[in-house]
């Protein structure tokens, strides 16, 4: 049966909404958008089927880059999540991996598609999102105790961790711990975290 999802949108938005959406000045659900089928076909705008999470966000970004649009304060449809959907299941390391992959893909597709004069601004915004989700995924690999996998992931993302432009102090600290590639430190962090969770 799944879970019915019907969030509430309260405003009518129109025009070029890309940066308002980036900065969360406007918020709308994909079910509030009027989209011509012809526009989708002409611009090859479809959901990325490789994404298990974040496919709606990726689609909305690409749509906002392509055209001005209307977002109405009503939900045109409801959708049900499958019973085994990632969206209504407990958070696991799989969630974090798929989120990290989604934000990698979003960064690539948006940077490739956007041709305006604010590309550096978009790069900064999406790089922060990408770094945040990647750090969160790697941190959960650490907490899971899979240090061999973690070491491989850190090595393949070493430059990004060292050049990290994360905004939060906690996230910056985590990035430094991950980038250290210090197995003893990683084990200590995991041990402390497990003790905290047992309290």
Residue ranges and their predicted role:
Residues 57-60, 103, 107, 130-135:
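Hydrophobic alpha-helical core bundles mediating ligand binding, dimerization, or RNAP-core interactions
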Residues 17-18, 121, 149:
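Exposed alpha-helical structural elements
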Residues 138-199:
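Membrane-interface aromatic/basic loop that binds lipid-linked glycans or pyrophosphate carriers
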Residues 115-125, 165-169:
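Short, surface-exposed acidic
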Residues 124-140:
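Amphipathic alpha-helical repeat scaffolds of TPR domains
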Residues 9-96:
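Conserved nucleotide-sugar donor-binding catalytic segment
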Residues 1-4:
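Conserved donor NDP-sugar-binding/catalytic core segment of glycosyltransferases
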Residues 75-83, 89-118, 136-161:
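Catalytic core of nucleotide-sugar-dependent glycosyltransferases
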């Amino acid at each position: 049966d799944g879970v019915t999802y019907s969030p509430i949108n309260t405003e009518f938005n129109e025009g070029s909404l890309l940066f308002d959406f980036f900065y969360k000045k406007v918020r709308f659900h994909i079910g509030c958008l009027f989209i011509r089928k012809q526009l989708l076909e002409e611009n090859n705008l479809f959901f990325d089927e490789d994404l298990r999470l974040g496919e709606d966000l990726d689609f909305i970004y690409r749509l906002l880059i392509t055209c001005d649009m209307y977002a109405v304060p009503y939900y045109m449809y409801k959708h049900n999540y499958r019973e085994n959907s990632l969206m209504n299941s407990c958070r696991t390391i799989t969630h974090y991996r798929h989120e990290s992959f989604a934000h990698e893909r979003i960064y690539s597709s948006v940077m490739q598609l956007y041709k305006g004069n604010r590309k550096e601004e978009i790069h900064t915004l999406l790089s922060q999102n990408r770094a945040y989700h990647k750090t969160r995924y790697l941190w959960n690999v650490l907490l899971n105790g899979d240090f061999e996998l973690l070491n491989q992931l850190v090595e393949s993302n070493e430059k990004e961790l060292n050049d990290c432009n994360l905004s939060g102090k906690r996230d910056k600290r985590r990035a430094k711990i991950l980038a250290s590639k210090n197995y003893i430190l990683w084990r200590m962090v995991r041990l402390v975290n497990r003790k905290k969770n047992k309290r």
